């Protein structure tokens, strides 16, 4: 369409940044990517989950087939409680039946390689470009890097992660123009209560192909996914000894990751396999804090932040990367409409600001519930508190597809690139998923019946333990230590 007079400066060659670049490419909008590292590839061994809401956009971009080739299929999910009680579901199969696209887990390093390889013009990537400042001009915006280079454009997009320089510059500029644009209290809402050791291990001797296994434990959980061949991805998500707030969230060393993993080595994983057996076969791992928060203000003038820079969630729901892909598509939709409606002239800053405000408002509304769900699931799987312990052990297994149904609603509510026709694979024929359905299988009345039965079971268990306890009802739950 020839609308190359509008230029986007993307800061960060992340999954979010490269997905946005692919979207802009398809929309015919000019862009450049500034990456502070010498290359864009993450450390191997860190897994990322792809859900249908992210995969359908990759399919629109012609990327999904390459990504899918990296994926080892998952058919079942096994959720184990500390006492060995197991909830077995066919959720991965239900996802494919419902959406035509699977839930898959792949190596982030390999995913980034695929995204990068699909660019025909790699000259738009500029490596070793650490951003130091952003400045607004009369009709444009400029970005200066540590080596003294300056890049000019119409919009700066911060796709540079949770430690975003673009976000910091946006706050600085916003507070100069309007004191109180972002307060110290708002900044401190970005916090970490949990951390994770992400890793990948070779096959455990005698162990065949893996499925998705979740092991709930008090103050931590294990997550396992099939990797290439008989290799296995592992996540050890654990509660920190205190809540850390921005900017004082620590970064962890390999030694700290080793200490954590060795401390949980005797906990069971699957049949006779202990975690120490997997840890002994490790190929690569890293230990990181799990920051959580979504900021309300994502933009100021010609600056917008997307992905982890403004919407950071824990990995338990597997939606951080997928919702970032959604945001890249949604931002592109808005920019394309803005640019085409003003062509051949550039849109004014006010018009751009209105587009960014609409994008900000819609994405915040979309992700607010997802963030709440992710926070809850993280704490549920770490059995953080009596109510969550009771729900996980005595209620969840009797609620059918409740949690998976919630995932279905999240997936079905995602957006797409509105200027690329949908195919059957990218969700053209996805059936609606109203709130009272879960996977289109269980009606709300079925859930109510299941929940009533489960609640009765909980009541009976609590009363029975209370009657057996000399201390009475108050110790009925607290005394229920779970052991293997």
Curated annotation (Swiss-Prot):
FAD binds at residues 35, 49, 108, 308, 321. Residues 1-21 form the signal peptide. It comes from the Eukaryota. GO terms for molecular function: FAD binding; monooxygenase activity. The active site is at 216. Keywords: FAD, Flavoprotein, Membrane, Monooxygenase, Oxidoreductase, Signal, Transmembrane, Transmembrane helix. This is FAD-dependent monooxygenase aurC. The chain crosses the membrane at residues 451-471. It holds the Pfam family FAD_binding_3. InterPro entries: FAD-bd (IPR002938), FAD/NAD-bd_sf (IPR036188), FAD_mOase_fung (IPR050562). Its EC number is 1.-.-.-.
């Amino acid at each position: 369409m020839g609308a190359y007079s509008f230029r986007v400066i993307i800061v960060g060659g992340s999954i979010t940044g490269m997905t946005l670049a692919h979207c802009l490419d398809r929309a015919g909008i000019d862009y450049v990517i500034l990456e502070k590292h010498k290359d864009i590839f993450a450390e191997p061994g860190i897994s990322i989950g792809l859900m249908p809401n992210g995969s359908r956009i990759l399919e629109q971009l012609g990327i999904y087939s390459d990504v899918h080739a990296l994926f080892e299929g998952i058919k079942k999910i096994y959720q184990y409680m500390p006492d060995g009680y197991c909830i077995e579901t066919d959720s991965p199969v239900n996802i494919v039946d419902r959406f035509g696209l699977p839930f898959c887990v792949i190596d982030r390093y390999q995913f980034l390689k695929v995204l990068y390889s699909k660019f025909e013009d790699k000259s738009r990537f500029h490596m070793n470009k650490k951003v130091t400042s952003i400045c607004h001009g009369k009709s444009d915006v400029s970005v200066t890097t540590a080596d003294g280079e300056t890049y000019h454009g119409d919009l700066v997009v911060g796709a540079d992660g949770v430690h975003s320089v673009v976000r910091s510059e946006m706050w600085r500029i916003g507070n100069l123009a309007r004191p109180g644009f972002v307060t110290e209290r708002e900044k401190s809402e970005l916090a970490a209560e949990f951390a994770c050791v992400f890793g990948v291990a070779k096959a455990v001797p005698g162990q065949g192909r893996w499925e998705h296994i979740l092991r709930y434990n008090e103050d931590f959980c294990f997550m396992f996914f099939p990797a290439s061949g008989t290799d296995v991805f592992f996540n050890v998500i654990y509660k920190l000894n205190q809540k850390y707030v921005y900017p004082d969230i620590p970064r962890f060393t390999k030694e700290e990751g080793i200490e954590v993993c060795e401390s949980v080595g005797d906990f069971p994983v699957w049949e006779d396999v202990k975690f120490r057996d997997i840890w002994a076969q490790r190929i690569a791992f890293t230990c990181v804090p799990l920051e959580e928060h979504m900021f309300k203000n994502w933009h100021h003038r010609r600056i917008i932040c997307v992905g982890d820079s403004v919407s950071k969630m824990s990995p338990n729901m597997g939606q951080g990367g997928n919702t970032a892909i959604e945001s890249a598509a949604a931002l592109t939709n808005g920019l394309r409409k803005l640019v085409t409606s003003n062509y051949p002239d550039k849109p004014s800053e006010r018009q751009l600001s209105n587009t960014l405000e609409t994008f900000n408002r819609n994405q915040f509304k979309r992700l607010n519930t997802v963030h709440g769900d992710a926070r809850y699931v993280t704490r549920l799987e770490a059995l953080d508190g009596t109510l969550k312990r009771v729900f996980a052990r005595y209620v969840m297994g009797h609620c059918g597809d409740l949690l998976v149904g919630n995932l279905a609603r999240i997936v079905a509510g995602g957006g797409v690139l509105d200027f690329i026709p949908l195919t059957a694979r990218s969700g053209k024929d996805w059936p609606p998923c109203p709130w009272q359905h879960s996977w289109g299988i269980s009606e709300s009345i079925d859930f109510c019946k299941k929940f009533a039965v489960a609640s009765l079971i909980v009541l009976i268990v609590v009363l029975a333990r209370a009657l057996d306890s000399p201390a009475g009802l108050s110790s009925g739950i607290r005394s229920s230590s779970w052991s293997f």
